[in-house]
Amino acid sequence: MVVPGPLALSLLLSSLTLLVSHLSSSQDIASESSSEQQMCTRREHPIVAFEDLKPWVFNFTYPGVRDFSQLALDPSRNQLIVGARNYLFRLSLANVSLLQATEWASSEDTRRSCQSKGKTEEECQNYVRVLIVSGRKVFMCGTNAFSPVCSSRQVGNLSRTIEKINGVARCPYDPRHNSTAVISSQGELYAATVIDFSGRDPAIYRSLGSGPPLRTAQYNSKWLNEPNFVAAFDIGLFAYFFLRENAVEHDCGRTVYSRVARVCKNDVGGRFLLEDTWTTFMKARLNCSRPGEVPFYYNELQSAFHLPEQDLIYGVFTTNVNSIAASAVCAFNLSAISKAFNGPFRYQENPRAAWLPIANPIPNFQCGTLPETGPNENLTERSLQDAQRLFLMSEAVQPVTPEPCVTQDSVRFSHLVVDLVQAKDTLYHVLYIGTESGTILKALSTASRSLRGCYLEELHVLPPGRLEPLRSLRILHSARALFVGLSDRVLRVPLERCSAYHSQGACLGARDPYCGWDGKRQLCSTLEDSSNMSLWIQNITTCPVRNVTRDGGFGPWSPWKPCEHLDGDNSGSCLCRARSCDSPRPRCGGLECLGPSIHIANCSRNGAWTAWSSWAQCSTSCGIGFQVRQRSCSNPAPRHGGRICVGKSREERFCNENTPCPVPIFWASWGSWSKCSNNCGGGVQSRRRSCENGNSCPGCGVEFKTCNPEACPEVRRNTPWTPWLPVNVTQGGARQEQRFRFTCRAPLPDPHGLQFGKRRTETRTCPADGTGACDTDALVEDLLRSGSTSPHTLNGGWATWGPWSSCSRDCELGFRVRKRTCTNPEPRNGGLPCVGDAAEYQDCNPQACPVRGAWSCWTAWSQCSASCGGGHYQRTRSCTSPAPSPGEDICLGLHTEEALCSTQACPEGWSLWSEWGVCTEDGAQSRSRSCEELLPGPGACVGNSSQSRPCPYSEIPVILPASSVEETTSCGGFNLIHLIVTGVSCFLVSGLLTLAVYLSCQHCQRQSQESTLVHPATPNHLHYKGGGTPKNEKYTPMEFKTLNKNNLIPDDRANFYPLQQTNVYTTTYYPSPLNKPSFRPEASPGQRCFPNS
């Protein structure tokens, strides 16, 4: 096949482009692989992450307080004194817990004056810059809104001020100025700071002691040239000051040198020349550099630490702030410092001349003793002239080793403390170096070449992503603890964590001088804690190396994006997102990320019908009705743009076409109430209704109600008296006569309940002489006559009782009767009639009548069991109107009826409703449902996700009292009288309580008014503008004076410089223990009763 020329040229160019791009990508991959290989072979020191260090660290914070820059250790009292912005704290050395907090803020007038001079509100605060524990006192100085002030306070109670003095020349005005101070064993304060508002007059100043106040020469840049003071130490006969300043002896450009300066502590100043000025001031350069043909100097001193046991001064040095970041630690012997000060001076004859070496007139200078004749009798004019012009040493102070102890590129060191550790074979100097990024480097200082510059670990005391320099760093050797001051907190970090290494390999691999493997106990411990020194193993021969193997981690998910998916013949759209295994990437054999890297959701889905439901019951029981069946488009439901189902979701058909309805059956109206069954004592009324056109009407045809509940009165009835009947007639005509009557009483309206009372008999005597008025005399005469004619008189006698009659009722207590006649014999010839009752009555059939069961009325239809998708109504009745007695017939028929409801389809996206929950105390029930859509569309999940309803009466919870159920019965007798008594009692008690509260408030107010006479209480003393004399007016205003060699600051105790606007208030907070009693329900007084309803 022949290819035309232009086409061949185009294909050739395309091939070359692909080849070049392939080669370029191959080179990039090879370069990346090579750099990663170099990273895996690089040796780095171990790093202790913030989360790993956190369990070992104690921290202290205080709301609204910042700049924890001054830390002072007080081991004898087991406390740490902390100076921050506007506050002083006493903390426990064990766990930095708060012992005391004292506010030390500037007054409102002082701050307002500061801001009027152009300073910001942030600058116009009281920043503590001097904090020294001296015996039983704490000496402290603060900037006090550019009006420095100092005070001495009790070391055990910071709120108690012993003495307050001027802070000028002892503390800087500006909190950003570096300063340092030390108190000697004689109680003299040596301060190195700037002593004017603008910060242009630096000085090393002595005060407060028995000697005269002295300072460096004022406005003489050869003595101090824009210095930054770093540290001050009281060593022997000298006071040493470490600083960095612009080098006056450097001829080309501006260069910063690090210096050490010293003065004799018994210096008394000059006479006529150098009056009130140091006569023993000297300074020398500190050399910290990498040796070589062209040395690399670390010129700027940042921190210094004195190790008195070894007569060593350790210093942290960095490069210039505008150059490449690099840091080093160098150590200097005090003998090397003395050697430099005993060497030649460097002197400049005039400003145009060079700085040249000049011999030391006193090569072995020592601070002499003060003669008895006077403090400056031995100072000659020549010696004062030499002291004025010869102060800069020609030779620099050389470090202990030619190379720095530790160096680090790309990092700036800021603080340093040193600990001496006795290992198994030698004594190690362990350096703890603070960095400007907020980490602490733990390093070894040793003469061994294999361990030179050896970093043991790097401690991350700040959480990831937070970078800030350390404000202060202190070490407590006895407790083996570091105390770190940050902008918002104080930390206590242990010097060693030997128990964190759980294996021998990890313990020995840490190369930590504190730690070794205890072979007897098989654990990592310190030398002091080892059980047997001979079995305690250490291996500090090389530096520890961090394991650079790193497992991969997923990065964040990308935003959701639309994507396509294929499912057989169907296709649709989805939302997709992805993440990469790059946070971090697996490195140096680390594991790949575990888990999905792609997430797919909300894929579109076409809807499909479910199967038809079964036909519902016919809508009518007779006559033409209809039946319904349904289906829903939820198998599956359409989602995220999928097609909806095509067709009907509901079908209907006729039913009962051939079942005509019978004549309507209905209840007729109720009839009138019947007469009450009893006139009293409780009866029953009834009324009836009839079921028209049938006998199957729902409900009851009879209703009953009680009537005439009042008790029946007892009715008594007496029978008439019988005629008088003679008894015991004598032959002489004397006799006794009797008559009878009976009493009946009926306590019930039922006549069968009548009871016969006692028979009552009356007797009278009729004498024979006729003196008595007896109506039966003729009858007696007849009897006598008949007796005389017929002597056989026959009295009547009862026949036997007849049988008992049948019971008057079949049940519920009837009665029966039996009778007898007076025929055995009948009374004749004037015989007496039978005495006694002719009839007897007896109770019978006391058992209850049998009861046949009958249905109660139907309850109302219940609520529908579902709001959609098909539910049911329900109603019930019970066989309790009346309930059947044992052995009798039960009710026939159904006790429950149900009907369909809510047959419409449910809204798309919702799950089924949950069951109704339990009733709350408010008498409500609730249920819920959830949306099953991940990203619901506009038509999905419409409606509420929860429903509530009033509880059925039978389910409303009743809150019972705490006492037992039996106790509640005692409240059943609660009536209106009890309610009135309770109300009156509550009113009286509330009145007494109100009176007591009012009297208590009046008493507290009087106490508060009395206390304000001594300590005025104001809402905010910084803004208090009361009408009386302010508290700050008790202090004498300060008259500002220019400080020069002829006008020095005398001792403040002579009151030469009264303080200006020292309106500094202190407020003390003591943390109180939490002794609040816990709430106990059983201690709640009273008892709640619920009367029976």
UniProtKB/Swiss-Prot annotation:
Residues 45-495 form the Sema domain. Disulfide bonds join C114-C124, C141-C150, C264-C367, C288-C330, C618-C655, C622-C661, C633-C645, C676-C707, C680-C712, C691-C697, C807-C844, C811-C849, C822-C834, C864-C901, C868-C906, C879-C891. Residues 551-605, 606-662, 664-713, 721-776, 795-850, 852-907, 908-952 form the TSP type-1 domain. It is a single-pass type I membrane protein. Keywords: Developmental protein, Differentiation, Disulfide bond, Glycoprotein, Membrane, Neurogenesis, Repeat, Signal, Transmembrane, Transmembrane helix. Glycans are attached at N59, N95, N157, N178, N287, N333, N378, N532, N539, N547, N602, N728, N944. GO terms for molecular function: semaphorin receptor binding. The chain crosses the membrane at residues 979-999. May act as a positive axonal guidance cue. Belongs to the semaphorin family. This is Semaphorin-5B. The lineage of its organism: Eukaryota, Metazoa, Chordata, Craniata, Vertebrata.
